[in-house]
Curated annotation (Swiss-Prot):
Record Pfam families: Kunitz_BPTI (PF00014)
Organism: Radianthus crispa
Protein name (record): PI-stichotoxin-Hcr2a
Source taxonomy: Eukaryota, Metazoa, Cnidaria, Anthozoa, Hexacorallia
PANTHER family, sorted: BPTI_KUNITZ INHIBITOR DOMAIN-CONTAINING PROTEIN (PTHR10083:SF381), KUNITZ-TYPE PROTEASE INHIBITOR-RELATED (PTHR10083)
Domain BPTI/Kunitz inhibitor: start-end pairs: 4-54
Length: 56
């Protein structure tokens, strides 16, 4: 879906939430640290959920 094409957005806050986003350049769900606010509409806590939604 189109949410899988959104870029990774860490956000300006300083929390530490391990998340996954779909990297459209590599075609893989990639880990990153989300700061806890002002992210995009799709970040996932679980690798398997990212893979299922984005078919990675």
């Amino acid at each position: 879906g189109s949410i899988c094409l959104e870029p990774k957005v860490v956000g300006p806050c300083t929390a530490y939430f391990p998340r996954f986003y779909f990297d459209s350049e590599t075609g893989k769900c990639t880990p990153f640290i989300y700061g806890g606010c002002e992210g995009n509409s799709y970040v996932d806590e679980k690798l398997h959920a990212c893979r299922a939604i984005c078919r990675a």
